[in-house]
């Protein structure tokens, strides 16, 4: 038996598709939006309409922005010699929030995952190889997750870049800032020991 009209049920169903929102959370979010119609729902709908009309994928790096090439690619303060390779836009944004890189980026659109049917043709690896051959590029930084799929992707890209005249590096893996050794898994501790640095 339906508790609300089909329009409200549709709103709940659509909200439930968002990451981190299940049916109960979606219902609460829908009720909150409806209660705050003028203060929240109307501005949100307007912002979403603008996003639909203006946001696009950068043809150079794969970032999302209101222009292509994106703001990062056109920033003259960025180091054109360095390309940071990430799996998705969320990873790019995380590095930007941390102010961890002054280079340019390349968004793969995921990682290789044979079990999920994701092969090289499904990612922007060919475009990365083309960019790596540009004369101004001297380093490719693989900022991929330390998962099996992330490491598989990193090895695959490294093999493809053998002929390019670039240094290929990857992010260090190990003990997080504020982390306690007792709570870390064996793989993380092992990687931290192998990648230790002078103090």
From Swiss-Prot:
GO MF annotation, one: DNA binding
Residue intervals of every C4-type zinc finger in the record: 58-73
Stored PROSITE patterns: RECR (PS01300), TOPRIM (PS50880)
Pfam families hit by this protein: RecR_C, RecR_HhH, RecR_ZnF, Toprim_4
Physiological role: May play a role in DNA repair. It seems to be involved in an RecBC-independent recombinational process of DNA repair. It may act with RecF and RecO.
Family: Belongs to the RecR family.
Protein name: Recombination protein RecR
Species per Swiss-Prot/TrEMBL record: Bradyrhizobium sp. (strain BTAi1 / ATCC BAA-1182)
Lineage: Bacteria, Pseudomonadati, Pseudomonadota, Alphaproteobacteria, Hyphomicrobiales
Gene: recR
């Amino acid at each position: 038996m339906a508790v609300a009209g089909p329009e409200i049920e549709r709103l709940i169903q659509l909200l439930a598709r968002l990451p981190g929102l299940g049916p109960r959370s979606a219902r609460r979010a829908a009720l909150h939006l409806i209660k705050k119609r003028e203060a929240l729902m109307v501005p949100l709908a307007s912002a979403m309409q603008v996003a639909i009309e203006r946001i696009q994928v950068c043809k150079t790096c794969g970032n999302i922005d209101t222009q292509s090439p994106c703001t990062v690619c056109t920033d003259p303060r960025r180091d054109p010699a360095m390309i940071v390779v990430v799996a998705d836009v969320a990873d790019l944004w995380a590095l930007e929030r941390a102010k961890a890189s002054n280079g340019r980026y390349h968004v793969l659109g995921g990682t290789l995952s044979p079990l999920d049917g994701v092969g090289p043709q499904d990612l922007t690896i060919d475009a990365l190889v083309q960019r790596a051959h540009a004369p101004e590029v001297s380093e490719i930084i693989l900022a991929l997750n330390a998962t099996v799929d992330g490491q598989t992707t990193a090895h695959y890209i490294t093999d493809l870049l053998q002929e390019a005249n670039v240094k290929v590096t990857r992010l260090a893996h190990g003990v997080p800032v504020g982390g306690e050794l007792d709570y870390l898994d064996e793989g993380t501790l092992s990687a931290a020991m192998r990648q230790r640095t002078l103090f």
